Amino acid sequence: MLVMAGLGLYDELDVTLKTVEFAKKVDKIYAEFYTAILTGTTIEKIEKTLQKEITVLNREKVEYETNKLIEEAKEKDIMFLTAGDPMVATTHVDIAVEARKKGIEVIILNAPSIYSAIGITGLQLYKFGKTTSIVFPEPNYFPETPYDVIKDNLSLGYHTLCLLDIQTDKQKFMTANEGLSVLLEIEEKRKEKIIDENTKVLVVARAGSIKPGLFYGKIKDLIKHDFGTPLHCVIILGKLHFMETDALKYLFENI
């Protein structure tokens, strides 16, 4: 049996009782934290909550040794833990599908993810378009996909959730400031007037924590602000409903 379980967004208190109960029954627990990470806790605290040792897999072991994990699930009850919800990342979906193909029972234990936590903004969830990711630019690698996604969503009046790059092996987490700078760089190159320094956007910091940071303002002001510890995300606003306008006024710190 393979149990795919999410840990939630911020700390060990996000772990569901259902996950705790299954953890007691399984033979072994694996986890990965390269697609997302819980910044408010440690692996030791999660192990204490689940009352069992956890083997942490790096990116290579998850992507290239999934067959070994799946084969192990044929003979034993295995739990695979991820930050957020277990079925958001394509890699995790692939693991579940491959296990089912081989006749292994797969149980999925859902958990809070950025897609549910984004409700704290007061924005209407059905008005979000395609999600995009902003990554750290590298030599000969500067993808403009986020710009294209924002452009398409804005044409339909939709909001855009921009997830920011995570490189856990380097303990490197893109800040909202860096993400906004990347978008402005792409605009400077493309000059399609999709976004500029006066565009009003949202920044959400530490979603899922007791005291998340919610910030609203023009890019030129937000880009200089200290949003505190990660993780951050950015929301480019589409057409606002009057109730959403009220939410921005009363739920956010206006910068």
Curated annotation (Swiss-Prot):
Molecular function terms from GO: diphthine synthase activity
Protein known as: Diphthine synthase
EC number(s) reported in the record: 2.1.1.98
Record's subunit section: Homodimer.
Xref: Pfam families: TP_methylase (PF00590)
Gene, per the UniProt record: dphB
UniProt GO BP: methylation; protein histidyl modification to diphthamide
Primary role: S-adenosyl-L-methionine-dependent methyltransferase that catalyzes the trimethylation of the amino group of the modified target histidine residue in translation elongation factor 2 (EF-2), to form an intermediate called diphthine. The three successive methylation reactions represent the second step of diphthamide biosynthesis.
Binding annotation for S-adenosyl-L-methionine: L9, D85, V88, S113, I114, L164, A207, H232
Gene3D superfamilies: Cobalt-precorrin-4 Transmethylase, Domain 1 (3.40.1010.10), Methyltransferase, Cobalt-precorrin-4 Transmethylase, Domain 2 (3.30.950.10)
Catalytic activity: 2-[(3S)-amino-3-carboxypropyl]-L-histidyl-[translation elongation factor 2] + 3 S-adenosyl-L-methionine = diphthine-[translation elongation factor 2] + 3 S-adenosyl-L-homocysteine + 3 H(+)
Xref: NCBIfam families: dph5 (TIGR00522)
Pathway: Protein modification; peptidyl-diphthamide biosynthesis
Key words, A-Z: Methyltransferase, S-adenosyl-L-methionine, Transferase
Coiled coil residues, start to end: none
EC category name: transferase
Taxonomic source organism: Methanococcus vannielii (strain ATCC 35089 / DSM 1224 / JCM 13029 / OCM 148 / SB)
Family the UniProt entry places it in: Belongs to the diphthine synthase family.
